[in-house]
Amino acid sequence: MATQLDVQTLRSVFQSRPDILSNIERNADTPARTTLFNEIASFVYERLGSADPEDGPASKRRRIDIAQLPTHPQPNGHAHGRAPPAGLSVDVAATDPVLLELRDISVTAPQRKKYDLCFTKNFLYARASGTSVPVQGVVYPLKDIEHAFYLPVPDKSQAQYNYVLLPRDSYLPTAKQAGANSGGGLQPLEPLVFTVPAAAPKPGSVVGPSSAAAEAVSDTYSSLLHWALTTSMRSAGNHSCQLVASDPKLFHSVARQPHRPNEKAVHVKAFRGSKDGFLFFLPTGILWGFKKPILFLPLDRIVAVSYTNVLRTTFNIVVELDTDIPGEANIAIEKEIEFGMIDQEDYGGIDETYVRRHGLADRSMAEQRKAKRELVENIKKPAAGDELAGGEGDADGLTALERAQREAEQQLQDEEDEMEEDYDPGSEGDSEGEGGSSGEDDDDDEAQGDYDDEEDDEAEGLEN
């Protein structure tokens, strides 16, 4: 029996592009081509289709909501939906009504140009002024944003701020050959970076059905965008991503800024290879920007931090990463990443107030960080499925994510208790040595506790 075109699937996939459909039907003149077209249609249909059979066939849906994009089960038991490639999102995003539009925003990545930023129910995307079509490659499903940061722009005489949004699979350092093999040739989204001044939006620059609500928080661009990003991600079902800001109380450089000398710098200059950039030591990890590729190294993926090429005026930092990413075999994560030519004056601040505070100099603590991350990851999917992430808890009043956090902390406490029970004073010399070490650990624990309290206060402040 001759191979037949899967017309139903093809029409479902290309219903908005009848020209493509007609070209396929015209060129399916051999069994090999027919099979190829059917395989392409099946692949795209699986990427766009709904996992819920009650939604009906895709051909009966006028638009495909991003919430229906399938997730991919992973070997460790939880689902991790990779951010859809840019090409699959443009047509889908264009069907979503724009709720809020911010005009003339300076986008610096993935493209450097002024665009209008549009918030819809499921997307954040850029479009050229006076057009209604999203810009290819600058369309971001709100559910797939994994990290969001609010950072001052270095070396500017006037205060400006960068918003950095990192979709899944966009921020870890990958080997050069990984891009060609990842996702069957479909590339993940790049980070989104846009810049705003420390001023209020201009009249007429904020439009859309939600502009009336936005007016109440439009004292500055920052207050407006904090509100817009947080509420949009929550409305789209993204309850895990928090907007994180740099804080000079947590880390700041001792070097004086020539452009704004009265303001503490929350960054240090650092090279990655021949590219100059800036390192930000943040509550959730280390970010290097703002030249491509922007990197973010989450604390729970850092195995250890060490120092090399320590000279009189500069030194290098080497960050060793946990490259074990279940289900992401096609993404080759670099094992070590080095940042060079850091000012020697900042060595103490980086080592004492950040690296040691987070236990990054101690390889033994890497397993604890990894276990905590995996525990939270494993609970995320069931939490989303049960609609617990919106803040509704069980009988104990906790959400699933909060419960995972408590379990992780309890696990670490149990390990510490076991170590104390197994402790044998031994000889006098051993006892003295371990006693001194215990004192240092107590100091570290107190510092870590204070730091975590500040971190929680900061996150609550951003959400409010």
UniProtKB/Swiss-Prot annotation:
UniProt keyword Nucleus, yes or no: yes
Domain of life: Eukaryota
Transmembrane segments: none
Keywords for the protein's UniProt record, in alphabetical order: Chaperone, Chromosome, DNA-binding, Nucleus, Transcription, Transcription regulation
Cellular component terms per the entry's GO annotation: chromosome; nucleus
Molecular function GO labels: DNA binding; histone binding; nucleosome binding
UniProt-annotated stretches for the region Disordered: 382-464
Major location category of this protein: nucleus
Subcellular location: Nucleus; Chromosome
Comp. bias (Acidic residues): 412-464
Keyword Hydrolase in record: no
Oligomeric form and interacting partners: Interacts with histones H3 and H4.
Family: Belongs to the RTT106 family.
Purpose of the protein: Histones H3 and H4 chaperone involved in the nucleosome formation and heterochromatin silencing. Required for the deposition of H3K56ac-carrying H3-H4 complex onto newly-replicated DNA. Plays a role in the transcriptional regulation of the cell-cycle dependent histone genes by creating a repressive structure at the core histone gene promoter.
Protein's recorded name: Histone chaperone RTT106
Species whose genome carries this gene: Chaetomium globosum (strain ATCC 6205 / CBS 148.51 / DSM 1962 / NBRC 6347 / NRRL 1970)
